């Protein structure tokens, strides 16, 4: 019985991708295909894994407020977006506004850091 509990614990810790890979491996080994009963049984174990897979990979950097150093924020927005000075100023004046969309987590964090260093308030969505 202890072995079954250990197996259950290991299966519960699988990500959705790992669970799908396991299903394919077992289908090949046993010469069967996953039917509805298998999918129903896997739903309980896959629920926590679905949350892990749903983790965002693309973010939107939103300028929520320019802060006290508006000129510095405008310069950073101009550099990040490639906009002209007038367009960057308009974007900053109209905060909250998205600065950049569909960026990876690392790039979004980098942009957020630059804007916050200039005195802006920023959110990642």
Curated annotation (Swiss-Prot):
Gene Ontology BP, a term: translation
Annotated Pfam families: Ribosomal_L12, Ribosomal_L12_N
Molecular function in Gene Ontology: mRNA binding; structural constituent of ribosome
Top-level taxon in the UniProt lineage: Bacteria
GO cellular component term, pick one: ribosome
InterPro entries: Ribosomal_bL12, Ribosomal_bL12_C, Ribosomal_bL12_C/ClpS-like, Ribosomal_bL12_oligo, Ribosomal_bL12_oligo_N_sf
Keyword annotations of the record: Ribonucleoprotein, Ribosomal protein
CDD domains the UniProt entry points to: Ribosomal_L7_L12
Family: Belongs to the bacterial ribosomal protein bL12 family.
Function: Forms part of the ribosomal stalk which helps the ribosome interact with GTP-bound translation factors. Is thus essential for accurate translation.
NCBIfam families, per database record: L12
Subunit structure: Homodimer. Part of the ribosomal stalk of the 50S ribosomal subunit. Forms a multimeric L10(L12)X complex, where L10 forms an elongated spine to which 2 to 4 L12 dimers bind in a sequential fashion. Binds GTP-bound translation factors.
Record-given protein name: Large ribosomal subunit protein bL12
Lineage: Bacteria, Pseudomonadati, Pseudomonadota, Alphaproteobacteria, Rickettsiales
């Amino acid at each position: 019985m202890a072995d079954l509990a250990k197996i259950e614990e290991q299966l519960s810790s699988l990500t959705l991708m790992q669970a799908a890979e396991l299903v394919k491996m077992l289908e090949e080994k046993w010469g069967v295909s996953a039917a509805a009963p298998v999918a129903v049984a896997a739903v309980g174990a896959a629920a926590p894994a679905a949350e892990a897979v749903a983790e965002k990979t693309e973010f939107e950097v939103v300028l929520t407020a320019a802060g006290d150093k508006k000129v510095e924020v405008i310069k950073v927005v101009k550099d990040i977006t490639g906009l002209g000075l007038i367009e960057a100023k308009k974007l900053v004046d109209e905060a909250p506004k998205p600065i950049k969309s569909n960026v990876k987590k690392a790039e979004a964090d980098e942009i957020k850091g630059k804007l916050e260093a200039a005195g802006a308030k920023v959110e990642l969505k």
